[in-house]
Amino acid sequence: MAVPKRKTSPAKRGMRRSADALKAPTYIEDKNSGELRRPHHIDLKTGMYRGRSVLVVKD
């Protein structure tokens, strides 16, 4: 069984756990519709992504 050679210091433990916290999702205002959407995601209202229509929107 593997056993640690040295004790992990509280600073090292804290640095390891720093990424464990949940972060609030980021939203940006869409240039075309003005709706809020996630970055690098399709705007579901218009079906546009990076200036191109990639999704046919149902009315």
Curated annotation (Swiss-Prot):
Pfam families for the chain: Ribosomal_L32p
A GO molecular function held by the record: structural constituent of ribosome
Recorded family membership: Belongs to the bacterial ribosomal protein bL32 family.
Organism in which the protein naturally occurs: Bartonella tribocorum (strain CIP 105476 / IBS 506)
Region Disordered: start-end pairs: 1-34
Keyword flag Ribosomal protein: yes
Keyword Amino-acid biosynthesis: no
Official protein name in the record: Large ribosomal subunit protein bL32
GO cellular component: large ribosomal subunit
The entry's keywords: Ribonucleoprotein, Ribosomal protein
A single GO BP: translation
Biased composition (Basic residues): 1-16
Alphabetical list of SUPFAM superfamilies matching this protein: Zn-binding ribosomal proteins (SSF57829)
InterPro entries the record matches: Ribosomal_bL32 (IPR002677), Ribosomal_bL32_bact (IPR044957), Ribosomal_zn-bd (IPR011332)
